[in-house]
A protein has these predicted regions:
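Glycine-rich phosphate-binding/catalytic subdomain of phosphoryl-transfer
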Residues: 1-50
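An N-terminal assembly and electron-transfer interface module characteristic of large anaerobic redox
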Residues: 2-14, 20-22, 132-866
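A short glycine/serine-rich beta->alpha loop
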Residues: 2-3, 38, 60, 114-120
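Glycine-rich phosphate-binding loops at beta-strand->alpha-helix junctions
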Residues: 72, 81, 86-110, 121-122, ...
Length: 866
């Protein structure tokens, strides 16, 4: 079953047939008559509409579009629903969509004669439901008393045990709100608290702190339909659903005329057993409070935002310092705030301990035949009635015991040897919980993820690995969820559990004694195996030369092919950013050609975007496929100055690519041919001087984004613009990494002098390039811009991307930003006002390998008027 939504395949085909003026009864036969089915991609059916419109505009015959739609729907189903699950030799199609011979033929094109259509395909679901009902009733007589019986009958029939389970589950919410009254004394100022994100953890602290200082505290009600309406009306960017709901909650506080709104900025969050440098909240937690408060213009309404920056990696002292920093804004002496903070900290500790105690008590009282469902998600997803989609109540009403991740001792597990670079504390907790559930024979997971959440796209793969063969229910939350769809999935999952035998706990069973499978991704390649690098445009040759200079047999993978991307996408299940299936598919395609042991370079970052997890998740996918011959080499980008075998040579390799991109396209091949595989300083400076002598012509477009999108995954957009005579001012990769290294100076202090030397080299080469240079003349100004707009931010090198776009906009006719579609960091830059900060018009290229004529039309229209 799809974890996201009802398939809607039949209704979608019907809708598109109507748009194209094709009678539905004729659609399938028309598709069968196609000679060249249109390539419409394999995205969610809703997004295929754009591809259909583009194909029609290009004059593609209706028959080819109809056939392309059939293939696209089938491929989307196979990749998003079937995924990597094993498919047997006998495949039966069922469902009303089988009336369409085009869809049937598309399935047969994928699986051949293994596919057969059920003779009762249109009613097979109803027949199966009837069989399940018959099985459930058995020999007992029916208790059905009619559809018009009072609703109270269902309530009265609820067993005492079910009611106890419901009461138990609700205790956690009661504990969170303990001591909260919501009353407002008109003589006091009021602090409004939106019931969102980490407030579901820190509310006891906030309530005790502000109440002790003499303020009224008002917590917004749990998310309602009105909250959703406000959020949809006010949200200015396409964020994940939990962040979008902040708009509605803040607006409700504005309507209540509070004096302050309290929502902390979560930069880092401590996890007891973690060994990563920093444990980050996601990129939204680092920026949402300030971004949304600005979007709603709360200051003009007389409301002050209280958003202390929580750097909890540095312990309670750092949190205390952040909260005490509010004393000046509130006009209250620090000693009074310190006393109030003590009350708040104690409230959080009491709540955490009480919830874990609850869980231990329940697990200790389980009967041998009890199956307990564990709701796995972040704390705000557990409590919010919209984000949990009413699932806890649906499970409880069906007689199951339900607990949450907080009831399990996940914080006590040390999984660092298995997940060395898992910098999301909630991710560490989720995977710890997965281990406990997989280990306990009678615990089963209900795993809720969020649509549009970058971290969830990676964690879902690791969660799947942890659960192994044990069944679990995963549902993705978004604002369009259907109650019927949720209930259908729950019923199917519970039915499968009912057919699983209950296992007796082994004697002396210890829940925390789980398997840890160490997984180390080396930063340095071995010399015994070839090393394959992902293609990176003009940087590829010099980076290959860098590794060869270290004695490594290095090669570059081919440019991304449709086949390689298809292999990678077959292993995706959500909205993974484009570089993930591209990198994975490149490895799988190369292993098809040569399955011999080989190394593949997939760099890591220290957070907080999803890209830092690519290497670990690709390793998990390869392990699940039984592919041990593919070894990953994963250096940490932030610490390369301290760990690279020859940092001078590495920086020269980066500069070589930057110099080639600065040159007019017609000069590049000649310059590269004159170089050694890894050019020396003299060769670099000579080339820069040569380029600087050439006149710079054409309109100037600045391009800023992620490295792969700027080089390999832009669908040929940038090379086309260059071929048409435009000059592209590409953000230099050497400067981008230099900025990242300076941003992490605590790890790179021994390299401080070297970093200054490299800054001087960039300045010199920039001067030599003249009008072709894209290096910043004043690197300090880059940091000043970043510190003003994104002072506490880690993820996707977003600080540099923001500052560089602003800097380049002063010497360009337009700014083009390139990022994978759905990338959270790109959304953050938009929310933080990048478009307004730039001195030239800005166009966002949101890339997912589906650039088409419609996209070109939008871009060309923008460039014409800018």
């Amino acid at each position: 079953m799809n974890k996201i939504c009802a398939a809607g395949t039949g209704s979608f085909v019907e809708e598109q047939a109507a748009r194209m003026g094709i009678p539905l009864a004729e659609f399938g036969q028309l598709a069968l008559s196609a000679e060249h089915p249109a390539a419409l991609g394999e995205r969610c059916t809703v997004f295929i509409e754009t591809a259909i419109a583009s194909a029609a505009a290009e004059g593609v015959p209706q028959a080819d579009i109809a056939a392309g739609l059939c293939h696209a729907i089938v491929q989307n189903y196979l990749h998003k629903v079937v995924g990597s699950k094993p498919v047997g030799q006998h495949i039966v199609l069922q469902g009303g969509v089988d009336y369409n011979p085009g869809i049937v033929a598309a399935f047969q094109a994928a699986y051949g004669s293994r596919v057969r259509v059920s003779p009762v395909f249109s009613i097979s679901g109803a027949y199966g439901a009837a069989l399940l009902a018959q099985e459930a009733v058995g020999d007992t007589s029916s208790q059905f008393v009619g559809f018009d019986s009072p609703a109270q009958a269902a309530e009265d029939s609820r067993s005492a045990e079910t009611q106890r389970n419901i009461d138990f589950y609700r205790q956690a919410d009661n504990l969170l709100l303990e001591g909260y009254t919501g009353k407002r004394d008109p003589r006091k100022k009021t602090v409004g608290v939106p019931f969102v994100l980490m407030i579901h953890k820190f509310f006891p602290m906030a309530n005790a702190f502000f109440t002790s200082l003499g303020f009224n505290v008002v917590l917004t009600d749990p998310t309602s339909e009105e909250t959703i309406r406000l959020s949809q009306q006010l949200a200015q960017s396409e964020t994940c659903y939990p962040v979008k709901l902040i708009y509605g909650h803040m607006q409700q506080l504005i309507d209540q005329k509070v004096d302050y709104i309290f929502l902390p900025t979560i930069h880092t969050m401590k996890h007891e057993k973690s060994r990563v440098k920093h444990n980050y909240g996601c990129v939204y937690m680092q920026t949402a409070a300030a971004s949304i408060a600005k979007a709603l213009d709360i200051e003009s309404k007389g409301i002050t935002l209280l958003s202390p920056v929580f750097d909890l990696d540095f312990g309670q002292e750092a949190m205390a310092s952040a909260m005490l920093g509010l004393s000046k804004i509130l006009g209250i002496p620090k000693p009074f705030c310190a006393k109030a903070l003590l009350s708040g900290a104690m409230a959080v500790r009491r709540h955490t301990a009480a919830v874990e105690k609850q869980g231990k008590a329940l697990l200790a009282t389980l009967r041998p035949d009890d199956k307990v469902l564990v709701l796995i998600t972040r704390n705000y997803g557990v409590s919010d009635p919209i984000l949990n989609m009413g699932i806890p109540e649906l499970l409880l009403e069906r007689g199951y015991k339900v607990i949450t991740l907080s009831h399990l001792p996940g914080h006590a597990l040390d999984i660092a040897d298995e997940y060395e670079n898992l910098y999301y504390p909630f991710g560490q907790h989720i995977l710890s919980g997965a281990k406990l559930i997989a280990h306990h024979p009678n615990l089963y997971a209900v795993y809720l993820t969020n649509h549009g959440c970058g971290p969830d796209t990676m964690l879902s793969h690791l969660f799947k690995q942890e659960m192994g063969d044990k069944p679990y229910l995963q549902i993705e939350v978004d604002e369009h969820f259907s109650n019927v769809g949720v209930i259908t999935r729950i019923e199917a999952f519970l039915n499968s559990l009912n057919h699983r035998p209950v296992e007796v706990l082994p004697k002396n069973f210890v829940l925390e004694q789980v398997d840890i499978r160490p997984c180390h991704l080396p930063a340095v390649p071995e010399k015994d195996f070839p090393l394959w690098l992902p293609p990176l445009g003009e940087y590829t040759a010099s980076l290959t030369g860098y590794f060869r200079a270290q004695g490594v047999d290095a090669h570059a993978l081919p440019h991304l092919s449709a086949h390689a991307l298809s292999l990678g996408r077959a292993e995706t299940s959500a909205k993974e950013y484009l570089p993930f299936p591209a990198l994975l598919g490149g490895i799988l395609a190369q292993q098809e050609v040569d399955p011999a042991p080989a190394q593949f370079l997939i760099p890591q970052t220290q957070g907080a975007e999803a890209d830092g997890q690519y290497a670990r998740v690709i390793r998990a996918v390869l392990d699940r496929r039984g592919n041990q011959s593919a070894k990953l080499v994963s250096p940490m980008l932030e610490t390369l100055p301290a760990t690279a075998q020859d940092r001078d040579a590495l920086f020269r390799a980066l500069l070589a690519g930057d110099i080639l991109y600065a040159a007019p396209a017609a000069m590049r091949a000649g310059i590269a041919a004159a170089w050694d595989t890894l050019p020396g300083w003299a060769q670099l400076h000579k080339a820069a001087v040569e380029i600087g002598r050439c006149p710079a012509t054409g309109r100037r477009f600045a391009t800023v984004g992620t490295p792969l999108c700027l080089t390999e995954l832009d669908s040929g957009v940038l090379s086309t613009l260059e071929a048409e005579g435009s000059q592209l001012l590409r953000a230099p990769l050497s400067e981008a990494l230099w900025f990242l290294w300076k941003d992490n100076m605590d790890a790179n202090k021994p390299c401080a002098k070297w970093l200054e030397q490299m800054a001087q080299e960039m300045q010199t080469i920039g001067a030599e390039l003249g009008a072709h240079s894209t290096f910043a003349q004043d690197t300090a100004a880059l940091f000043e811009t970043a510190d003003t707009i994104l002072p506490h931010f880690a993820g996707g090198n977003g600080r540099y991307r923001y500052a560089k776009a602003v800097e380049l906009s002063g010497r360009a006719d337009a700014v083009l930003t390139l990022a994978p579609r759905y990338e959270n960091a790109a959304t953050i830059l938009d929310m933080r006002g990048l478009r307004d900060a730039c001195k030239a018009p800005l166009f966002q290229l949101s890339l997912d390998n589906d650039w088409d004529e419609t996209a070109w039309s939008r871009l060309r229209s923008f460039l014409y008027y800018c």
